[in-house]
């Protein structure tokens, strides 16, 4: 209830004079007042001395909103200096949305010189009156400075208001024990909230939790469900994982054709491991007609992306003349290159 009042920012209730009688009654009950003669300013409930004061205050917030809208319009059009002027005017009338947007301008040097301290100050001003985006930005800046306990405090504030990215970040904090004690169950709960809002990374995170049995009982079918959601949003990681799960029959019936379909999607998105696995399918004839030429082409693409396993297979192709003319010099070259990269990655 209090949060709802806070988000309104400034409203006036005077014995039902207010535009929304239901909300006015809620405020009356919340405060335990009988007469209900008060107005709200910047999230603080103040007893109204007279009706005129309340009306003047209401006009200020209305004007502040207009100034903010002008600022935002100029910002979108790229007129950053004008935007800042309007934001400052709005801020003087208590518009905290303007403060958050000013923070963005200071952080990125739009219309003003970059100043992360002023940016933080502006974000914090909005965060303290419940602005979820500002809370996220405050948390992000704390995180950048490795102040994880402070970061988790503000991620949680934003997450509880439904801020999607903050929910995922909070899940990460619990999963990896950043600023809080590790708790996989709590991590999964936050991942799921973000995932249900469509956060692609959170969908992968919760899929991995089900895959590994971290915070939940291991459930490959549930993992597949979440990987599919992320894959359909273009995640090459999820597409690769689906290719693997269909290839191995994890949570689904083994299906090499379906495996290839997902590997190909991931490969088209540049996923090096997917390119290598797709090459293996052509090399072994799993789900496709065996084709050494196509396999070798894909192995070279994977090798160019640093997959040393692909280099070993290229060496094998030159050793036995598969998809290429037999050439022991080339075979040795690729084998040595693979060894060097493998040792470097250890």
Report residues per predicted region:
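Sec/Tat signal peptide C-region and signal peptidase I cleavage site
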Residues: 19-24
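TPR/TPR-like (Sel1-like) alpha-helical repeat modules
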Residues: 126, 312, 316-319, 325-343
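Short aromatic-glycine-(Arg/Gly/Cys) micro-motifs in beta-strand/loop hairpins
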Residues: 27-43, 58
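Short helix-capping/linker turns of helical repeat alpha-solenoids
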Residues: 60-62, 74, 92-96, 108-110, ...
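Hydrophobic face of amphipathic alpha-helices that form TPR/SEL1-like repeat modules
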Residues: 66-76, 100-108, 136-145, 169-176, ...
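A short, charged, amphipathic alpha-helix used as a generic interaction element across diverse proteins
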Residues: 48-61
């Amino acid at each position: 209830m209090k949060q709802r009042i806070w988000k309104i920012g400034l409203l006036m209730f005077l014995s039902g004079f207010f535009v929304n009688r239901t909300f006015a009654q809620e405020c009356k009950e919340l405060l335990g007042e009988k007469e209900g003669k008060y107005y709200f300013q910047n999230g603080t409930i103040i007893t109204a001395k007279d009706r005129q004061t309340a009306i003047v205050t209401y006009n200020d917030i209305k004007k502040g909103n207009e100034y903010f809208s002008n600022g935002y319009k100029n910002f979108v059009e790229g007129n950053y200096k004008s935007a800042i002027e309007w934001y400052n005017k709005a801020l003087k009338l208590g518009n905290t949305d303007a403060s958050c947007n000013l923070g963005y301008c200071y952080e990125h040097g739009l219309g003003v010189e970059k100043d992360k301290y002023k940016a933080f100050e502006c974000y914090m001003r909005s965060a303290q009156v419940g602005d979820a985006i500002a809370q996220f930005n405050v948390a992000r800046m704390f995180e950048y400075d490795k102040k994880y306990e402070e970061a988790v405090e503000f991620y949680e504030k934003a997450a509880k208001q439904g801020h999607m990215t903050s929910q995922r970040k909070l899940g990460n904090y619990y999963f990896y024990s950043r600023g809080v004690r590790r708790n996989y169950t709590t991590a999964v709960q936050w991942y799921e909230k973000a995932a249900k809002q469509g956060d692609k990374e959170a969908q992968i995170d919760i899929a991995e939790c089900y895959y590994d049995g971290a915070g939940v009982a291991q459930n490959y079918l549930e993992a597949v469900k979440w990987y599919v959601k992320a894959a359909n949003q273009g995640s090459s990681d999820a597409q690769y994982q689906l290719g693997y799960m269909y290839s191995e029959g994890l949570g689904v019936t083994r299906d090499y054709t379906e495996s290839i379909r997902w590997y190909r999607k991931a490969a088209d998105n540049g996923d090096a491991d997917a390119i290598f696995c797709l090459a293996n399918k052509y090399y072994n004839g799993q789900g496709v007609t065996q084709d050494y030429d196509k396999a070798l082409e894909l192995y070279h693409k994977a090798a160019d992306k640093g997959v040393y396993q692909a280099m070993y297979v290229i060496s094998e192709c030159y050793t036995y003349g598969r998809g290429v003319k037999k050439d022991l010099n080339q075979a040795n070259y690729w084998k040595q290159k693979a060894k060097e990269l493998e040792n470097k990655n250890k």
